[in-house]
């Protein structure tokens, strides 16, 4: 098989197999071809991975942050040297076009290793607090063994976004990728060992729904970081609460993108397309509710339709391809069912709406789809679809659109396009979301915090803020004189 790894798991610095685990088939979404066959972790594999992490972590934590950071920066360099190889693997794993993966996937992971490697010492600083004759100081200390649970839309990026801050803070990690995309994280683990990471600090185990609870409920696990759906997040939070584990979650969204009548229409359309069709719409922060001022609606839809229908759908390994398949047959069927709901509930189909006829019948393709005249109560406007389906809604005034944008259980992201920056700042101040863009969309450099509010999760990925979620504050009071006691 064209992408078969040496074994299913990577534990304590080497590949490990246990064929007693449930078979996981890795399928290339463009053709339906099985490209690798792996096995889910058995309870014994889970124990082996956590034991390796627990054993390796204390010595790693005793190293200076600068020394830890140096290893991560080496890993970043190796990832960049192998960007083509890693990008092709990511395309096989996910079906995303190579023109995307080569600029956005391993590259983003390398950025994460480089950023956290570079700020290792400064980012973990404590504080000095004078108290008259006495004083106190604080320091950030690692949590111990951390578990990362990844999603299937950006497998290599997520493996790095969780691994980099965890490692630089002095922790060890056991990472479980999605069973839909099991391959990329294994390569990240290999590269970390090559860069000099001591064995046992970054372990990758495959798994299904049975594996997650084994990791989350393990008494030696101190923290769980999940990227996934809201229903999965609720289950993980409930399980972790039993042992009061640290938890961060980056979950789903149904984010608003607001286009005012003074916006640059072409730029706003570009933002809306990036926020709906990039990675075939499989991005948690997508602005899938596009609110367009009624005054410019007709022109907006005219230009949007032309640009959407001009997108090239095809072989993900062809560098000209702009739209690849969905990650799986099940995801394609889910998206197609939402498209049918949109039609049935009275939305106007502007573009797309089905399976393209220019691609392999075995691939999991869906046309980039635009609905107009969408109302707030329609299913496609309220539920996360996680596919290339854009909903365009009309609005008339600022107060109205803010209220409607906030009328959702989600709070991951949002965006505003307008030439009036005063209005832009006023609006984003009132939007209930964790990550917002003005005259841009879906840009997430590692230097800035990324995360949501409401049902879209808590905690932040990236930036200095991420280190707070992989460490805890220790306070030390120092008495400088004799103790005065009343007895």
UniProtKB/Swiss-Prot annotation:
PANTHER family: ALDEHYDE DEHYDROGENASE-RELATED (PTHR11699). HAMAP family: BADH. Binds 2 potassium ions per subunit. Pfam families: Aldedh. K(+) 2 binds at residues 244, 454, 457. It comes from Rhizobium rhizogenes (strain K84 / ATCC BAA-868) (Agrobacterium radiobacter). Its EC number is 1.2.1.8. This is Betaine aldehyde dehydrogenase. Belongs to the aldehyde dehydrogenase family. Dimer of dimers. It catalyses: betaine aldehyde + NAD(+) + H2O = glycine betaine + NADH + 2 H(+). The keyword NAD applies. The gene is betB. SUPFAM superfamilies: ALDH-like (SSF53720). CDD domains: ALDH_F9_TMBADH. NAD(+) binds at residues 150-152, 176-179, 229-232, 252, 284, 384. One of its GO terms (biological process) is glycine betaine biosynthetic process from choline. InterPro entries: Ald_DH/histidinol_DH, Ald_DH_C, Ald_DH_CS_CYS, Ald_DH_CS_GLU, Ald_DH_N, Aldehyde_DH_dom, BADH. One of its GO terms (molecular function) is metal ion binding. K(+) 1 binds at residues 26-27, 93. The active site is at residues 162, 250, 284, 461. Keywords: Metal-binding, NAD, NADP, Oxidation, Oxidoreductase, Potassium. Involved in the biosynthesis of the osmoprotectant glycine betaine. Catalyzes the irreversible oxidation of betaine aldehyde to the corresponding acid. Its cofactor is K(+). NCBIfam families: BADH (TIGR01804), PRK13252.1 (NF009725). The modification Cysteine sulfenic acid (-SOH) is found at residue 284.
């Amino acid at each position: 098989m064209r992408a078969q790894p040496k074994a299913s798991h990577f534990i304590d610095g080497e590949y490990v197999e246990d064929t007693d685990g449930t078979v996981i088939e890795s399928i290339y979404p463009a053709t339906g071809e099985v490209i690798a066959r792996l096995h889910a972790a058995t309870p014994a594999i889970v124990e082996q991975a956590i034991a390796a992490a627990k054993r390796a972590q204390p010595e790693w934590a005793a190293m200076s942050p600068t020394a830890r950071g140096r290893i991560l920066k080496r890993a970043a360099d190796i990832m960049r040297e192998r960007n083509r190889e890693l990008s092709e693997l990511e395309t096989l794993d996910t079906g995303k076009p190579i023109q995307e993966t080569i600029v956005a996937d391993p590259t983003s992971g390398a950025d994460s290793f480089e950023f956290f490697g570079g700020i290792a010492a400064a980012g973990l600083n404590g504080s000095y607090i004078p108290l008259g004759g006495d004083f106190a100081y604080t320091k950030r200390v690692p949590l111990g063994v951390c578990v990362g649970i990844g999603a299937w839309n950006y497998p290599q990026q997520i493996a790095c976004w969780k691994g980099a801050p965890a490692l630089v803070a002095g922790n060890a990690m056991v990472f479980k990728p999605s069973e839909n995309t099991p391959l990329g994280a294994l390569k990240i683990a290999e590269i970390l060992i090559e860069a000099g990471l001591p064995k046992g600090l970054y372990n990758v185990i495959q798994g299904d729904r049975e594996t997650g609870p084994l990791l989350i409920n393990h008494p030696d696990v101190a923290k769980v970081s999940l990227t996934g759906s809201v229903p999965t997040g609720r289950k993980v939070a409930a399980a972790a609460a039993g042992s009061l584990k640290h938890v961060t979650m980056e979950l789903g969204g149904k984010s608003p993108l607001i286009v005012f009548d003074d916006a640059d229409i072409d730029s706003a359309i570009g933002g809306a397309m990036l926020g709906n069709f990039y990675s075939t719409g499989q991005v948690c922060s997508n602005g899938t509710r596009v609110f367009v001022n009624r005054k410019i609606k007709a022109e907006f839809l005219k230009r949007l339709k032309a640009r959407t229908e001009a997108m090239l759908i095809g072989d993900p390994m062809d560098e000209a391809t702009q739209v690849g398949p969905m990650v799986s047959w099940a995801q394609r069927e889910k998206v197609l069912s939402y498209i049918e709901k949109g039609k049935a509930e009275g939305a106007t189909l502007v573009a797309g709406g089905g399976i393209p006829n220019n691609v392999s019948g075995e691939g999991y393709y869906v046309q980039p789809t635009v609905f107009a005249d969408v109302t707030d109560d329609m299913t496609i406007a309220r539920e996360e679809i996680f596919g290339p389906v854009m909903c365009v809604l009309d609005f008339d005034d600022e107060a109205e659109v803010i209220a409607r944008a906030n009328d959702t259980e989600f709070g991951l992201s949002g965006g505003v396009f307008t030439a009036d920056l005063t209005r832009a700042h006023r609006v984003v101040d009132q939007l209930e979301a964790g990550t917002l863009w003005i005259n841009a969309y879906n840009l997430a450099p590692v230097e800035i915090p990324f995360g949501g509010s409401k049902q879209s999760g808590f905690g932040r990925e990236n930036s200095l803020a991420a280190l707070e979620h992989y460490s805890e504050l220790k306070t030390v009071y120092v008495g400088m004189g004799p103790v005065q006691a009343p007895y």
